[in-house]
Amino acid sequence: MQQNIERNQVSMTTSRFVWGAVMALVALGSASAAELNLPDGAALYRARCGTCHDNPQDRTPARDVIARNSPAFIMAAMNGVMAPMAAGLSEAEKQAIALHLGARPAGGSQEINPHAIWGPPSASMPLDGPKCKGKIPPIDLSTPDQWNGWGAGITNARFQPNPGLTAADVPRLKVKWAFNYPGSKNGQATVVGDRLFVTSMSGAVYALNAKTGCVYWRHDAAAATRSSVHVVQLPAGAPAQYAIFFSDWTKAAVALDAQTGKQLWKTTIDDQPGVQMTGSPTYHEGKLFVPISSGNEAFATNDQWECCKFRGALVALDALSGKVLWKTYTTQKEPAPFRLNKLGKQMWGPAGGSIWSAPTIDPKRGLVYVATSNSYTEVHHEGSDAVMAMEIETGKVRWINQVTKDDNYIIGCPRAANCPEKVGPDFALGNSPILHTLQDGRQYIVVGQKSGAVYAMDPDNDGELIWMRRVSPGSELGGVEFGMAADAENVYVGISDVITRKGGKPGVYALRIRDGADVWAFPAPRTPCRWNNIFCHPAVSQAVTAMPGVVFAGSMDGHFRAFSTSDGKVLWEFNTAAAPYKTVAGKQADGGVMDGAGPTIAGGMVYVHSGYAGRSTQNAGDLRGREGNVLIAFSVDGK
């Protein structure tokens, strides 16, 4: 614990230094690098940045996208999420690059709003909605229609059996309220009783009234977060009656008092190079299971980065104290030097195998299941692109089913010096395994892949493959991305295929879980968008959600649809980006690209995010863009 406290103190010191550098650039305003006696920013950009940003691929923003941001924002990025790519640059060199690229406001530095910089200063911002009036009611975990955590249960089926509305009600859904908040990506809504909990990349964690959107409290975390919240009743004598758990994007798991938002504990659980935690934690019988992922795929585009020392992992903590109980890596082999890259920098392996999604609990077998992503180097990684089973009590790996071997991938190949000798297709398993019980009592593990494949595995036979169905050709940004949903008969599959080398098949597909047979298909149509970039696309990357008779799915073009589970007929459709919303704060906000965290259903209402990572602006990747960052609450007739 002392070590964790010391690390947090170091992190706070570093954050103050970084923020000081950012504020310095804000103060400099429209000054040039030459006036400030800085190095040649143009030359530094060509040498360190141009290879990727002048020829962008996949998730890399183009130079003109970066240039729309202020020098202060670019400086914050180089000292934050882009720090690995900026490794080796002095502060003066970073300032020179930022001033070379960044937009300078006509009115001088006073027009640069430091609070608009992507990061954790949410504490300095006004509350994002009206404060709830009156006495705060107690948390009620007894309600049958709650949506708690990522998958609405430890099996991660993303199915709401008690939605509080029927399939016949769905065509009458209308917007009841909208909530707009800072941060380029946001966590999925958790709804328990009248309480809605949600996280954001601004560092703010909110407790809202689920029916009205008013704010009970806002906790200003020290780091961005995009995981879903899990609400738990603590044992008698604990410092709070109820706690919420989440992980931040950097290195910590956090517990807050669900009633007040006060921090109960915070534990550093990983400090590997380039760690970025996106998957949501899962709670079970006093233990919190937190997945570990990274940004090494992008960081390795920096030719000076020692690629790669990161291994995906699952961490189990005591939910009451935050004490780490065990930690299991997706490969048991520690990364070791194996060759030099094209520029003579040391390379390491095995590396990779991030866990991007929430773990799945199997109490019957005493196991926890995780799905893993690609490897980064050509050193064999037995736990990449796989489903892994670990013992709940010890973390011991019971079995691994690797569906794609040697999928060695980083962004920017073949240009980047750190590229594997043979580059893989990046067919990660980025969604949670679904533990499904058939009517005859047998259980299957069902999981999707960015290859467009869906797999059913046998938990009684070490994950042996039962069936595989290739729904689409897939790609780095294709196939199954954030999550599927399952009811008693079918699994509902959202297909992205926003970028494919063959004919993509974006849309929603239903497969019979018993044998993988096709039930129905909805090839999503192309529709115009407010924004003009590659993310004006019918891709269904956002996680899908089901209730009796209905499956909900959002697409990147902003369309939110409800389908009949029996035949795929569209029951209801709403364009979340067609018109601005008047938010609960009385301000105007826009919807946009739908991606990442999926819809949640509880108490007769449906909640969904519209807007993702600045992709709804004319230049995808402008994280300061104000368009597309809203939580929308729907109810029957808007009542």
Swiss-Prot record:
InterPro entries documented for this protein: Cyt_c-like_dom_sf, PQQ_b-propeller_rpt, PQQ_rpt_dom, Quinoprotein_ADH-like_sf
Highest taxon of the lineage: Bacteria
Binding-site residues for heme, renumbered to this chain: C49, C52, H53
Cofactor: pyrroloquinoline quinone
SMART domains tied to this protein: PQQ
GO molecular function: electron transfer activity; heme binding; metal ion binding; polyvinyl alcohol dehydrogenase (cytochrome) activity
UniProt KW keywords: Cytoplasm, Heme, Iron, Metal-binding, Oxidoreductase, Signal
Compartment(s) where it occurs, according to its Swiss-Prot or TrEMBL record: Cytoplasm
Secretion signal, residue range per the UniProt entry: 1-33
Keyword Iron in annotation: yes
Sequence ranges assigned to domain Cytochrome c in this UniProt record: 36-152
Record field: catalytic activity: a polyvinyl alcohol + 2n Fe(III)-[cytochrome c] = an oxidized polyvinyl alcohol + 2n Fe(II)-[cytochrome c] + 2n H(+)
One Pfam family this sequence matches: PQQ_2
EC number(s) from the headed UniProt entry: 1.1.2.6
A single Gene Ontology CC term: cytoplasm
Subunit (UniProt): Monomer.
Similarity comment text for this entry: Belongs to the bacterial PQQ dehydrogenase family.
Function comment: Catalyzes the oxidation of polyvinyl alcohol (PVA) in the polyvinyl alcohol degradation pathway.
Protein's name according to its UniProt entry: Polyvinylalcohol dehydrogenase
Protein source organism: Pseudomonas sp
Gene that encodes the chain: pvaA
